[in-house]
């Protein structure tokens, strides 16, 4: 727990600063990035290394050496440039001094008057002081779309922490990203990943997957040196982002799928043949070079992703950054890609990722999409499995916008050949089981698992970064490389396992976030509620999961958020870690268990659970970190507290030990095309912004008549009156937007609400209707992601270091696009490409 007590249990007062208790001051060097030149953003020129004085204490270590130590608080204030009387330069006595960190300094970069910044900051802090922290920041995902998104977020969090707002009702951090909060998470996971029958699951971070498998890495323009700290050793980071991602996979920081350059079933067989465990065999084969990670050679045919199922995602019409790269390299179809790869440009190639001169086009053999409408992804698919819509199926719905569990209730049968999602996957499982006979039996599968957050080995590399392939350490599964686990796959019985609740919940219980509790009572109840399987075989007498409602009941009964008895057990499990009793947070609802029929009658409010850091209480509105502050539950971090400072070696190397201003990166996508292929109209360069969809929900229903009427009936892009005037563009003109990543053809919406310098396209406007051809590509105009490309940030690859460790949908690489720019010009000819298709 985080009680203020010493090791003997005595009350103590923790020292925040050494301002009045020090052995002198030391000059500390801080990296500065605000002076980085950018064609479209204003720099503030200062030395790229700033020295500031910090108070220190001298500590004598066991070996007799003396070290100077400082508190994080003192280092933080020095980072902000606050003059506290310790002498030295690069500090400010008032807000008007032009020193990095002051309101005057930021005014040069942002154009926001310093008086406005000072006013808002004072009002925010004053409100927090008067109300005990009831100042709140509500933020959407827009800030998360910049390359240095984590620096943006850390800036907000720092302000909240310093004002005492975190974990206070009515204050703190309210992050909104849409209908994305999976509240009954621990009930859903066994069902979603088959954890009731076999563990661990094979999971992957999507951003790295598509970066490699759609060959976006071959076109990388951002040099790692461009974002490295001036205090770092550049020779240690001579590699590319692709290389660093492969290193992260090799050290167990990030997952990989495909994993190795051999079939994992064959690896298990080979290990058995030589009498070794799979772990020993894989380690030995990796060391002698007979085996390698798939991502070290992503263009080798044996490492292609051959089949892909897309469900609950419009990958090719909405979410997939680097759309044209996916069309070319993943699908092997027509594309609008204009850029040259590293080989064609004669640029430096990756050091650890094998380069093949001939880039593959069409890695996928099979693309299957489940959707209830013919979206862009469905149009590109080999097979489309029509799914039921909201009123044709039974399902669960939760959100971060309210604390209720909602049902989707089947009012009518699915139309025509469509089926519910559950029935489709149930049918796939049945067909696979039938086809497996004589081909695949009970097989052993070798699964590589990264070093996961909230597990005992999450602190696998506490004393720096060691790469076994470079000879810096031995390859030790679960410590210096991924954990290697053999999992049994019973293919002929896949259907029986899919339609029943497996025995691992009886034997191992359930849990989440590092906690675990017994679930035998819940399994027994589900056997009575859903009835038990009567057929002979592996699932005999197990609780049945035949229908979508059966599946919903499993989720509801296993999750502490919807079963009070489980919630009490979960809080008790947490108490075993903290040494404090937390069961009072749920004991009043111990006999409350939400059934599917309950939420059909009325949406039900969830129960407080230790899976989340806020409370669902009649007197406390949900607030992130409320239980950390009021129940003294440690944050799941290296220190157990909120951290201003991150001391991981890569964080330091990239200048992100502390939060600081990082300007947008230069994606270098404009120069190769600007004024090079003119159509006679003026070309201008604008910042590419893609807000949340205006006339629909993500990619749903934006193509019906009502929505199209509201949005002018086809793709539209918004730009300012000033920019439109300078380029001779009038409202409703057809314009083209392009860079080396691809091109878009759309109509212009000229608006005074848009700031000069930016151009805005609401996301998920698909290319399925009223989309003419692009003049520059000769193919149909693209979607909002046609002009973007995935650019990985190395610090998002860190693992094995407490909170800096991979977790499914928690931490890993992410795609960004706000740093991107496009060339905008008026179109001369609008070609609808209506000529007959020739084969």
Language-model segments: which ranges?
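Phosphate/diphosphate-binding loops
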Residues: 353, 364-366, 372-373, 411-433, ...
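A glycine-rich phosphate-binding loop feature that marks nucleotide/adenosyl-phosphate handling sites
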Residues: 123-124, 140-142, 172-183, 442-457, ...
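Long, contiguous, secondary-structure-rich segments that constitute the structural scaffold
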Residues: 276, 423-486, 507, 550, ...
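Flexible glycine/proline-rich, aromatic-decorated loop/lid segments
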Residues: 376-408
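Long, well-ordered, tryptophan-enriched scaffold segments
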Residues: 1-131
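Conserved short loop/turn motifs at secondary-structure junctions
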Residues: 105-109, 139-146, 178-180, 314-315, ...
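Flexible, glycine/charged-enriched surface loops at secondary-structure junctions
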Residues: 131-136, 167-174, 340-341, 438-445
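Extended redox/cofactor-interaction regions of prokaryotic respiratory oxidoreductases
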Residues: 66-79, 84, 161-380, 484-727
């Amino acid at each position: 727990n985080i009680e203020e007590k010493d090791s003997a249990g005595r009350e103590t007062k923790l020292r925040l600063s050494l301002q009045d208790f020090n052995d002198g001051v030391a000059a500390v060097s801080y990296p500065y990035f605000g002076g980085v030149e950018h064609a479209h953003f204003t720099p503030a020129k200062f030395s790229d290394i700033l020295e500031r004085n910090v108070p220190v204490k001298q500590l004598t270590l066991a070996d007799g050496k003396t070290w100077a130590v400082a508190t994080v608080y003192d280092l933080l204030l020095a980072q902000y440039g606050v003059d506290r009387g310790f002498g030295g330069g690069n500090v400010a006595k008032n807000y008007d001094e032009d020193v990095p960190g002051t309101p005057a300094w930021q005014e040069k970069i942002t154009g926001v008057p310093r008086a406005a910044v000072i006013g808002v900051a004072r009002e925010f802090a004053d409100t927090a002081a008067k109300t005990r922290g009831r100042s709140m920041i509500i933020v959407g995902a827009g800030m998360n779309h910049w390359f240095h998104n984590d620096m943006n977020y850390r800036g907000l969090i720092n302000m909240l922490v310093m004002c005492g707002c975190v974990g206070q009702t009515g204050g703190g951090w309210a992050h909104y990203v849409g209908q994305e909060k999976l509240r009954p998470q621990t009930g859903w996971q066994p069902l979603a990943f088959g954890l009731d029958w076999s563990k661990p699951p094979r999971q992957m971070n999507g951003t790295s997957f598509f970066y490699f498998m759609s060959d976006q890495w071959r076109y990388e323009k951002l040099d790692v040196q461009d974002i490295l700290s001036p205090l770092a050793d550049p020779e240690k980071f001579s590699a590319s982002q692709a290389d660093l991602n492969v290193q992260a996979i090799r050290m167990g920081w990030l997952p990989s799928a495909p994993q190795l350059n051999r079939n994992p079933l064959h690896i298990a067989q080979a290990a058995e043949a030589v009498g070794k465990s799979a772990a020993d065999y894989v380690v030995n084969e990796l060391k002698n070079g007979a085996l390698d990670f798939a991502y070290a050679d992503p263009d080798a045919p044996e490492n292609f992703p051959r089949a892909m199922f897309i469900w609950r995602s419009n990958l090719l019409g909405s979410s997939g950054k680097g759309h044209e790269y996916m069309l070319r390299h993943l699908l092997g179809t027509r594309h609008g890609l204009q850029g040259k790869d590293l080989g064609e440009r004669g640029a430096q190639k990756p050091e650890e990722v094998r380069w093949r001169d001939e880039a593959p086009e069409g890695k996928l053999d099979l693309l299957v999409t489940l959707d209830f409408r013919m979206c862009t992804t469905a149009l590109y698919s080999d097979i489309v499995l029509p799914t039921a819509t909201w009123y044709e199926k039974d399902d669960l719905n939760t959100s971060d916008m309210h604390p209720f569990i909602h049902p989707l209730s089947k009012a009518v049968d699915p139309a025509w050949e469509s089926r519910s999602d559950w029935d489709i996957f149930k049918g796939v499982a049945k067909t696979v089981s039938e086809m497996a006979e004589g081909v695949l039996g009970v097989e052993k599968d070798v699964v590589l698992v990264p070093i996961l957050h909230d597990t005992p080995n999450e602190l696998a590399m506490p004393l720096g970064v060691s790469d076994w392939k470079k000879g810096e350490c031995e390859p030790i599964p679960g410590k210096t490389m991924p954990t290697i686990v053999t999992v049994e796959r019973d293919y002929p019985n896949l259907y029986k396992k899919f339609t029943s609740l497996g025995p691992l919940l009886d034997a191992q219980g359930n849990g989440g976030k590092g906690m675990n509790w017994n679930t035998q009572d819940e399994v027994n109840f589900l056997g009575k509620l859903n009835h038990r399987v009567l057929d002979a075989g592996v699932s005999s007498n197990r609780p049945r999961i035949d229908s979508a409602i059966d599946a919903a009941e499993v989720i509801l009964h296993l999750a502490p958020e919807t079963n009070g008895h489980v919630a009490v057990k979960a809080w008790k499990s947490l108490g075993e870690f903290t040494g404090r009793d937390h069961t009072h947070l749920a004991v009043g609802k111990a006999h409350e268990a939400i059934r599917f029929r309950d939420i059909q009658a009325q949406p039900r409010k969830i129960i407080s659970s230790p899976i989340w850091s806020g409370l669902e209480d009649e007197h406390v509105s949900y607030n992130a970190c409320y239980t950390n502050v009021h129940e003294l539950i440690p944050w799941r971090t290296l220190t157990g507290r909120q951290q201003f400072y991150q001391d991981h070696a890569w964080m330091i190397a990239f200048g992100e030990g502390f939060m600081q201003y990082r300007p947008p990166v230069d994606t270098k996508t404009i120069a190769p095309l600007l004024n090079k292929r003119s159509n006679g109209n003026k070309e201008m360069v604008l910042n590419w912004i893609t807000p949340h969809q205006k006339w629909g929900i993500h990619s749903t229903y934006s193509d019906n008549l009502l929505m199209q009427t509201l949005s002018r009936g086809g793709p539209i892009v918004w730009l300012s009156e000033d920019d439109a005037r300078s380029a001779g563009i009038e409202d409703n003109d057809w314009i083209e937007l392009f860079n080396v990543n691809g091109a878009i053809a759309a109509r212009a919406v000229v608006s005074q609400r848009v700031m000069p310098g930016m151009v805005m396209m609401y996301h998920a406007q698909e290319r399925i209707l009223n989309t003419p051809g692009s003049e520059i590509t000769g193919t149909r105009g693209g979607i909002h992601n046609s002009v973007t490309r995935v650019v990985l940030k190395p610090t998002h690859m860190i693992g094995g270091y407490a909170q800096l460790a991979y977790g499914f949908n928690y931490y890993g690489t992410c795609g960004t696009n706000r740093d991107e720019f496009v060339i905008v010009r008026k179109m001369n000819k609008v070609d609808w490409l209506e000529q007959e298709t020739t084969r």
